[in-house]
């Protein structure tokens, strides 16, 4: 079964799934901090100002630029800031392949919180990762995401489509 995303031909922007928006808890961001240079400029391309990425990284003294499709900033069309040190976020699951493709094209260090299931599933994906330098970091427990920042408890095992 082919799982690569079908692209919207008119816009050249990958189509998103309505279940793509899950929010990351702080405990999934904190392990990244030790790998970042102090006072870095970080672009969070899938994040609103309420994002845990924005809040945690800013609180650690980093300059953070957040952009989000809902406020008109499309990651696939947005001009990458020249002086950005890192690109960090939790991308929409249904377009993660296209996100990684663009990140490799941009050529800046990045950290994307994604599940590894299906990451290398197709030959196209496998080749893309094989042709680029990247590292993986695994957590010692499964991440429980929020569907709404107002939720008291994270949603366990969110659906991925």
Can you name each region flagged by the protein language model?
Residues 1-161:
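Class I S-adenosyl-L-methionine-dependent methyltransferase catalytic core
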């Amino acid at each position: 079964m082919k799982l690569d995303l079908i692209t919207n031909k008119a816009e050249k922007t990958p189509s998103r799934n309505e279940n793509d928006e899950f929010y990351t808890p702080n405990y999934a961001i904190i392990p990244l901090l030790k790998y970042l240079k102090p006072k870095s400029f970080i672009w969070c391309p899938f994040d609103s100002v309420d994002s845990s990425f924005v809040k945690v990284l800013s609180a650690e003294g980093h300059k953070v630029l957040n952009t989000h499709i809902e406020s008109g900033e499309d990651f696939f069309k947005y001009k990458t800031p020249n002086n950005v040190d890192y690109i960090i976020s939790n991308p929409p699951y249904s377009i993660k392949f296209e996100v990684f493709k663009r990140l490799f094209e941009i050529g800046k260090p990045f950290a994307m919180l994604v599940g590894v299931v299906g990451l290398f599933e197709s030959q196209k994906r496998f080749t893309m990762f094989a042709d680029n330098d990247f590292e993986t970091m695994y957590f010692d427990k499964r991440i429980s995401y929020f569907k709404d920042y107002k939720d008291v408890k994270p949603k366990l095992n969110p659906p991925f489509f």
